[in-house]
Amino acid sequence: VKIEAGTRKDATMGKAILEELEAVVGEGNVAAAPEEAGGGFLKAGSKNPEWIRVAPGTTEQVQAIVNLARENKIGILTCTNRYALAEDLCRRGILIDFARLNKVERVDTRNLVAHVERGVTWKRLKAALKPLGVKTYAPVAANSSSVVETIVARAVGKGITKFPDYPLMNMKVVLADGDVLKTGTHGFNEAAADGRNEGGPNLSQWHVGADDIFGVVTRASIMLWPVCEARSCLVYGFEEIDEVLKALKEIPRTELGVEYVAINRASLQRLLGGAGDGFPAWSLVVGFEGRQKLVSHNEDRAGRLLEKYDGSRKDSLVPAMTEQLDETWMEASDNHTAFFARFPRVIELDEKVQEAAEAARVGRADVGKILVSVDRGRAVYAVYDWFCEEDCAAALESLNLSLVDLGAFFDRPHGSLGRKIYTGIPNHLPVLRRIKGFLDPENVLNPGRILREEDKAWDPPKVPEGEIGLTVSNLKEVVGKLRACVGEPWVSDNPVDLISHGRDFTVFSGERPNVVILPESTEQVQQIMRIAYEHGIPVVPQTTGFNHGGLTISRKGGILVDLRRMDRVCTVDDEAMTVTVSPAVRMRYVWWEAVKYKATEGVHLKPILPLTLGSVSLLSNYVARGAPGTAAKHGNATEVTVKMTWVLPNGEVFEVGPGAIPGIGNLPIQYCPGPEINGMFFNADGQFGICTELTTKLYPEYDNVVELEELLTGSCLEPDGHKAFCKIVDATYDVARENITEFMYKGHPGAFALGVASKMEGISIKDALNMSPRHPLALMVSGFDAEEIAIKKEILKEILEKHTMYIIDPS
């Protein structure tokens, strides 16, 4: 039964339903009267919807509510923003109010994670964290007073300049069948770890940004940050937006500072109060935190860089803005919009917003603007508020539709904006519909949200009747079709050729495939997939000796798609600091191409590479969810990949990432609009298709990196191996909290010996091994100048000494 809330005659919500709901949540926690059902979720002047509002106090009660709704063919509605979506006001259903689900279950100050229920507000969480010496991230424009709703919605934090990933680890989700899904490593053991990634594909990431269409989130585990010794900021005033944008783009690429937030006069006046006459047109706030000595150094160097722009210091604003850096900023008005954009497009987009405001009779002085530098100056997050009494929803809807055409990326679009964006991405809605179909087959959860009745599901390939599989005659026909597809020289079923494709980088012997084919384009891969399904032949992709995920050759023969000819794409975008590669482009080649490009003056670009061979395909390693050596600073491949092109099993092409939206361009944001479906393709062992192109982030590195980067090794004299290991673990925790290292690696004696022997004449590997510590801790630091490196080394030395460790000096 398909349930479309507000349209079905049999979706009854009578007295019996009210009594059953009260039996679940208790008397007084169900509201059915029209004037009460909307609770605080309606804007002033909104009509009263036909809802039953129910307030559960536990996840188990949410399960019971979902089961009750499904059994009675009633839709479940949730409000993931401050106000209900306009499209939900005309729907009938049970609205879940999470206000009573408000426990801060646990705060883990060692691992910097808080486990909070959905009803916990920002105010409540801040009060709970304050005595513990930790804090949460600070949103620029929170969509909800609920911490969980804000973070699961990927709301942008002020610190997105340095910390571009959203601070979400795990979720507890009530599915449409009433079962509870615990995402990430919580699916195995909540107490052991709070890892975001599952053992295989990141299927549970579907619930991020999904606004509860696949499941109802009731709890989240969120990242925390330590409260540092020093917190400060610089404030510079500017009169022109173009000069502000230069500073927002260029200075973050030096990696000095945490936040880069530009606020116009109208928004600053609303934030701080007062007349605002003394405020500049734009105030650029650059935030710093850490050890006092390091903060003072970085503040001084960033201040020197800011002097070259046409602005002036506004020291009188520093105390107030330093305090504001860690405050939660809500959406500042009911007339609000926000989006990501590439730097070259911001001025045109800003002018469009201004024109629309004037057309809606909103004065120039009443248009609030906030611009945030994203991930070291790759892009901008732009926030706009029209400070007026009138409801400008229609004008903003029209504005947003026009902004998409100019390159604005809205990551959680709804209504007409959502339809324009989702229908513009080939195969996006069919994939979403397919996921919805098996997670919520009866369409109970937020029916009509994102997906509509007319949206077609992804069509799985069908194997026709007749001879299929690994038979002699069938394979002969397949080989003929494959040769017609890519050319005779690039297809072989010769045993001599197949032997070399029967081994891989694992302990398994592998089996020879029946056919090897070497395509050179995405279009040819599409044809191969269609031929394979037409004849019922398994397909396995391979690149540079490493398969996409499983690192194993098919055990049953089939078609091995060798992608080594697809090695022609290696395109660097220095504006967005990204590189786009095809499957066979090797890591060492990406490095040499990237370093040719500048991030800013004195700074070039570099890829972040995993600890593997330079001859390995970058695409294959990233798709296999490889971890770079600098994962402590930059994250894993899932956090740095911004676009992928996949050939699905039915031969259709599916692009994931903002760049898949027509007109957006190469926007380096690591997630799709709406539900985060890109996670399912990572570490999936090729189950969902073949990746033919991938775009990933590059990172800034100083040109004189040899002088401004140093690798240190820490160890201890503790003779007991286990106690020594525990000291290393404790020291690693403390070092990580400082956010000052490029690289942290608890190595082994062999790795240390190889490093020493390669750098010191007259020392053999055997000699180096004899003097190696049992648990070496490799730490790499870099900096703006030699003074910054010296400060960081001093901090590391202090931490290691605290744990009775020392820095090894091989000389």
Which residue stretches match the model-derived regions?
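Short, conserved charged micro-motifs
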Residues: 61-64, 124, 241-246, 292-300, ...
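FAD-binding subdomain of flavoenzyme oxidoreductases
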Residues: 105-107, 118, 123-247, 251-253, ...
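Long, structured ligand/cofactor-binding scaffold of large enzymes
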Residues: 41-134, 146, 150-156, 502-600, ...
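Short amphipathic alpha-helix segments
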Residues: 17-20, 244-270, 346-363, 392-400, ...
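General beta-strand structural signal in soluble alpha/beta enzymes
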Residues: 30-34, 55-56, 76-80, 96-98, ...
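Short beta-strand-to-loop capping motifs
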Residues: 235-240, 286-292, 339-345, 382-389, ...
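Terminal amphipathic helices with adjacent charged low-complexity linkers/tails
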Residues: 260-264, 268-319, 742-775, 780, ...
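Conserved glycine-rich FAD pyrophosphate-binding loop
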Residues: 3-13, 19, 27, 48-51, ...
